[in-house]
């Protein structure tokens, strides 16, 4: 698949991005390389392969949830320039 200006404009609009004119050719080249790589992956014959969710027999081992006290809020708020209780204090911007 060739990435042309029309497709790049559509992608630019859908992604809400603005691409500089200097970067357009480079972006088109990179997108073409990505699409070519995906095309190669799509050509692989996987009909004889069985779908695998996990390579570990019995699935992924999970740890038990262990409740413990956390000091994360205080750790984060100690770097705040201003705080009120467990909240950041910021200037009022909406009346």
From Swiss-Prot:
<dbReference type="Pfam" id="PF02686">
    <property type="entry name" value="GatC"/>
</dbReference>
<dbReference type="GO" id="GO:0005524">
    <property type="term" value="F:ATP binding"/>
</dbReference>
<dbReference type="GO" id="GO:0006412">
    <property type="term" value="P:translation"/>
</dbReference>
<dbReference type="GO" id="GO:0006450">
    <property type="term" value="P:regulation of translational fidelity"/>
</dbReference>
<dbReference type="InterPro" id="IPR003837">
    <property type="entry name" value="GatC"/>
</dbReference>
<comment type="similarity">
    <text>Belongs to the GatC family.</text>
</comment>
<keyword id="KW-0067">ATP-binding</keyword>
<keyword id="KW-0648">Protein biosynthesis</keyword>
<protein>
    <recommendedName>
        <fullName>Aspartyl/glutamyl-tRNA(Asn/Gln) amidotransferase subunit C</fullName>
        <ecNumber>6.3.5.-</ecNumber>
    </recommendedName>
</protein>
<dbReference type="InterPro" id="IPR036113">
    <property type="entry name" value="Asp/Glu-ADT_sf_sub_c"/>
</dbReference>
<dbReference type="GO" id="GO:0050566">
    <property type="term" value="F:asparaginyl-tRNA synthase (glutamine-hydrolyzing) activity"/>
</dbReference>
<dbReference type="GO" id="GO:0070681">
    <property type="term" value="P:glutaminyl-tRNAGln biosynthesis via transamidation"/>
</dbReference>
<comment type="subunit">
    <text>Heterotrimer of A, B and C subunits.</text>
</comment>
<dbReference type="GO" id="GO:0050567">
    <property type="term" value="F:glutaminyl-tRNA synthase (glutamine-hydrolyzing) activity"/>
</dbReference>
<comment type="function">
    <text>Allows the formation of correctly charged Asn-tRNA(Asn) or Gln-tRNA(Gln) through the transamidation of misacylated Asp-tRNA(Asn) or Glu-tRNA(Gln) in organisms which lack either or both of asparaginyl-tRNA or glutaminyl-tRNA synthetases. The reaction takes place in the presence of glutamine and ATP through an activated phospho-Asp-tRNA(Asn) or phospho-Glu-tRNA(Gln).</text>
</comment>
<keyword id="KW-0436">Ligase</keyword>
<keyword id="KW-0547">Nucleotide-binding</keyword>
